[in-house]
Amino acid sequence: MTERFVYHGSNIIVDKPKILTNGFFKDFGYGFYCTNLEKQAKRWAMTRRNNHIVNVYKLKELDAFNKLIFDSMNEDWLNFIVNCRRGLEHNYDVVEGPMADDTIWNFIEDYIGGDISKEAFWELVKFRYPTHQIVFCNEKALQAVIFERAYSL
């Protein structure tokens, strides 16, 4: 198996990841969020005050976990994000797929509010740059995330 690495942008070194269950509801619910796109983790880190740190993790095999993987933005992805952003819980250990950034989230809110149709939503998001996120939703899933190193930007 090829080694797989994921990245987490922050203002601190996160050598012991934790499941965060506070703040606003996120795309895939509460958990520890990473990406396989180093450039995206750098963008996340640059949004932080003071320090800009990219944490690098090696992933163990994920086959034993209850996973939900979205290969693209599709109807199931949209429905899942809407439910998670509304605070509905799920029973997955790991969820992976495209990210609804602020612009896409605005379109989702417009769709939820009935301001745009589902067809208009898909038209608006189809030209967005590729994004990726993987969330580790519980302590069991965090066992697959092995801290390798961190670096400052």
Place the predicted regions along the sequence by residue.
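Short aromatic-glycine-(Arg/Gly/Cys) micro-motifs in beta-strand/loop hairpins
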Residues: E3-K26
